[in-house]
Protein backbone atom coordinates (compact mmCIF):
# COMPACT_ATOMS: atom_id res chain seq x y z
CA UNK A 1 0.00 0.00 0.00
CA UNK A 2 1.28 3.45 -0.92
CA UNK A 3 0.49 6.22 1.58
CA UNK A 4 1.21 9.88 0.92
CA UNK A 5 1.47 12.22 3.88
CA UNK A 6 2.91 15.68 4.05
CA UNK A 7 5.42 16.95 6.55
CA UNK A 8 5.50 20.50 7.84
CA UNK A 9 9.25 21.09 7.84
CA UNK A 10 9.72 22.90 4.53
CA UNK A 11 12.81 25.11 4.88
CA UNK A 12 12.93 26.27 1.25
CA UNK A 13 9.22 27.08 0.94
CA UNK A 14 8.22 30.49 -0.32
CA UNK A 15 4.99 31.53 1.37
CA UNK A 16 2.79 34.60 0.97
CA UNK A 17 0.33 35.70 3.62
CA UNK A 18 -2.61 37.86 2.53
CA UNK A 19 -4.15 39.50 5.59
CA UNK A 20 -7.15 41.77 6.09
CA UNK A 21 -6.64 45.06 7.90
CA UNK A 22 -10.29 45.18 9.09
CA UNK A 23 -10.43 43.72 12.62
CA UNK A 24 -6.64 44.11 12.76
CA UNK A 25 -6.61 43.81 16.56
CA UNK A 26 -7.52 40.14 16.05
CA UNK A 27 -5.75 39.58 12.73
CA UNK A 28 -2.43 40.78 14.17
CA UNK A 29 -2.50 37.74 16.49
CA UNK A 30 -3.34 35.44 13.59
CA UNK A 31 -0.35 36.85 11.69
CA UNK A 32 1.98 36.39 14.66
CA UNK A 33 0.84 32.77 14.99
CA UNK A 34 1.28 32.09 11.28
CA UNK A 35 4.76 33.58 11.11
CA UNK A 36 5.84 31.79 14.28
CA UNK A 37 4.63 28.43 12.92
CA UNK A 38 6.27 29.00 9.53
CA UNK A 39 9.63 29.88 11.05
CA UNK A 40 9.78 27.75 14.19
CA UNK A 41 8.01 24.57 13.07
CA UNK A 42 8.26 24.79 9.28
CA UNK A 43 11.82 26.19 9.37
CA UNK A 44 10.89 28.68 6.64
CA UNK A 45 13.45 31.45 6.22
CA UNK A 46 12.33 34.98 7.04
CA UNK A 47 13.24 36.20 3.54
CA UNK A 48 10.88 33.58 2.04
CA UNK A 49 7.80 35.02 3.78
CA UNK A 50 5.86 37.89 2.19
CA UNK A 51 2.98 39.66 3.96
CA UNK A 52 0.38 41.53 1.89
CA UNK A 53 -2.17 43.72 3.70
CA UNK A 54 -5.60 44.28 2.13
CA UNK A 55 -8.58 46.34 3.36
CA UNK A 56 -10.86 43.45 4.39
CA UNK A 57 -11.78 39.79 4.00
CA UNK A 58 -13.78 40.48 0.83
CA UNK A 59 -10.54 41.55 -0.92
CA UNK A 60 -8.64 38.39 0.02
CA UNK A 61 -9.69 36.17 -2.94
CA UNK A 62 -8.54 38.66 -5.59
CA UNK A 63 -5.25 39.24 -3.79
CA UNK A 64 -4.65 35.53 -3.29
CA UNK A 65 -5.42 34.94 -6.97
CA UNK A 66 -2.74 37.48 -7.95
CA UNK A 67 -0.28 35.82 -5.56
CA UNK A 68 -0.96 32.34 -6.97
CA UNK A 69 -0.40 33.64 -10.50
CA UNK A 70 2.95 34.90 -9.24
CA UNK A 71 3.55 31.41 -7.85
CA UNK A 72 3.19 29.86 -11.30
CA UNK A 73 6.08 32.06 -12.42
CA UNK A 74 8.40 30.87 -9.65
CA UNK A 75 6.87 33.02 -6.92
CA UNK A 76 5.14 31.31 -3.99
CA UNK A 77 4.68 27.67 -3.05
CA UNK A 78 1.59 28.45 -0.95
CA UNK A 79 -0.59 31.36 0.11
CA UNK A 80 -2.21 31.81 3.51
CA UNK A 81 -5.34 33.97 3.81
CA UNK A 82 -5.94 35.56 7.22
CA UNK A 83 -8.86 37.66 8.38
CA UNK A 84 -11.81 37.92 10.71
CA UNK A 85 -15.50 38.30 9.88
CA UNK A 86 -17.75 38.77 12.92
CA UNK A 87 -21.53 38.42 12.66
CA UNK A 88 -23.39 41.65 13.23
CA UNK A 89 -27.02 42.68 13.02
CA UNK A 90 -27.22 42.69 9.21
CA UNK A 91 -26.79 40.22 6.34
CA UNK A 92 -23.34 41.69 5.61
CA UNK A 93 -21.67 38.78 7.46
CA UNK A 94 -23.16 36.15 5.12
CA UNK A 95 -22.09 38.03 2.00
CA UNK A 96 -18.53 38.70 3.11
CA UNK A 97 -17.88 35.32 4.76
CA UNK A 98 -19.49 33.36 1.93
CA UNK A 99 -17.78 35.20 -0.92
CA UNK A 100 -14.42 35.09 0.85
CA UNK A 101 -14.62 31.34 1.47
CA UNK A 102 -15.97 30.53 -1.99
CA UNK A 103 -13.46 32.80 -3.70
CA UNK A 104 -10.47 31.34 -1.88
CA UNK A 105 -11.59 27.79 -2.62
CA UNK A 106 -12.02 28.66 -6.28
CA UNK A 107 -8.53 30.16 -6.45
CA UNK A 108 -6.98 27.04 -4.91
CA UNK A 109 -8.78 24.73 -7.32
CA UNK A 110 -7.92 26.82 -10.38
CA UNK A 111 -4.26 27.44 -9.48
CA UNK A 112 -3.43 24.04 -7.94
CA UNK A 113 -1.38 25.96 -5.39
CA UNK A 114 -2.18 25.50 -1.69
CA UNK A 115 -4.38 28.26 -0.32
CA UNK A 116 -4.76 27.90 3.45
CA UNK A 117 -7.96 29.30 4.95
CA UNK A 118 -7.18 31.24 8.11
CA UNK A 119 -10.25 33.47 8.05
CA UNK A 120 -12.24 33.43 11.27
CA UNK A 121 -16.02 33.55 10.86
CA UNK A 122 -17.44 34.01 14.33
CA UNK A 123 -20.61 35.01 16.14
CA UNK A 124 -18.82 37.41 18.50
CA UNK A 125 -15.62 39.29 19.20
CA UNK A 126 -15.03 36.94 22.13
CA UNK A 127 -15.09 33.88 19.86
CA UNK A 128 -12.66 35.57 17.48
CA UNK A 129 -10.25 36.42 20.29
CA UNK A 130 -10.41 32.81 21.56
CA UNK A 131 -9.42 31.52 18.10
CA UNK A 132 -6.61 34.03 17.66
CA UNK A 133 -4.33 32.66 20.32
CA UNK A 134 -6.17 32.14 23.60
CA UNK A 135 -8.50 29.25 24.56
CA UNK A 136 -9.00 27.73 21.10
CA UNK A 137 -5.41 27.94 19.87
CA UNK A 138 -4.27 30.17 17.04
CA UNK A 139 -6.00 29.58 13.71
CA UNK A 140 -3.26 31.57 11.95
CA UNK A 141 -0.68 29.03 13.10
CA UNK A 142 -2.97 26.18 12.04
CA UNK A 143 -3.38 27.71 8.58
CA UNK A 144 0.41 28.05 8.23
CA UNK A 145 0.96 24.40 9.12
CA UNK A 146 -1.77 23.37 6.67
CA UNK A 147 -0.08 25.36 3.90
CA UNK A 148 3.29 23.71 4.56
CA UNK A 149 1.83 20.21 4.72
CA UNK A 150 -0.09 20.75 1.48
CA UNK A 151 3.05 21.94 -0.32
CA UNK A 152 4.62 18.56 0.46
CA UNK A 153 1.49 16.50 -0.24
CA UNK A 154 1.08 18.04 -3.70
CA UNK A 155 4.79 17.59 -4.47
CA UNK A 156 4.53 13.91 -3.55
CA UNK A 157 1.45 13.42 -5.74
CA UNK A 158 3.07 15.06 -8.77
From Swiss-Prot:
5-amino-6-(D-ribitylamino)uracil binds at residues 22, 57-59, 84-86, 117. CDD domains: Lumazine_synthase-I. Pathway: Cofactor biosynthesis; riboflavin biosynthesis; riboflavin from 2-hydroxy-3-oxobutyl phosphate and 5-amino-6-(D-ribitylamino)uracil: step 1/2. The active site is at residue 92. Keywords: Riboflavin biosynthesis, Transferase. Belongs to the DMRL synthase family. GO terms for molecular function: 6,7-dimethyl-8-ribityllumazine synthase activity. This is 6,7-dimethyl-8-ribityllumazine synthase. It comes from Pectobacterium carotovorum subsp. carotovorum (strain PC1).
